[in-house]
Amino acid sequence: MSTYAFNRELRLLTPEHYQKVFQQAHSAGSPHLTIIARANNLSHPRLGLAVPKKQIKTAVGRNRFKRICRESFRLHQNQLANKDFVVIAKKSAQDLSNEELFNLLGKLWQRLSRPSRG
């Protein structure tokens, strides 16, 4: 049976983890956010979030964005490849409704989980 928990092992926790993702990564983006991914040697995907105060001004907005990203990742984790993902917010992300943001994330997860053609 699949589990949908979002445990500590499913998170990028240290600056070193984030740095590894930014090196030799591939990305999928939209006008509202970018997801950067890099393969890991683990048996599960991991998620990191980068939501700059400069992009989403209010704490409420940043927390909403992070909450929806975590929930989307939690529900899609069993279909995702074993990669480390970093979601980076852009200014226009605060204008999306919760449902629009959730649907956009679903499409980007799917795009990044496809096998590479190279």
Curated annotation (Swiss-Prot):
One of its GO terms (biological process) is tRNA 3'-end processing. It catalyses: Endonucleolytic cleavage of RNA, removing 5'-extranucleotides from tRNA precursor. Pfam families: Ribonuclease_P (PF00825). SUPFAM superfamilies: Ribosomal protein S5 domain 2-like. Its EC number is 3.1.26.5. It comes from the Bacteria. InterPro entries: Ribosomal_Su5_D2-typ_SF (IPR020568), Ribsml_uS5_D2-typ_fold_subgr (IPR014721), RNase_P (IPR000100). Keywords: Endonuclease, Hydrolase, Nuclease, RNA-binding, tRNA processing. Belongs to the RnpA family. RNaseP catalyzes the removal of the 5'-leader sequence from pre-tRNA to produce the mature 5'-terminus. It can also cleave other RNA substrates such as 4.5S RNA. The protein component plays an auxiliary but essential role in vivo by binding to the 5'-leader sequence and broadening the substrate specificity of the ribozyme. Consists of a catalytic RNA component (M1 or rnpB) and a protein subunit. This is Ribonuclease P protein component. It comes from Vibrio cholerae serotype O1 (strain ATCC 39315 / El Tor Inaba N16961).
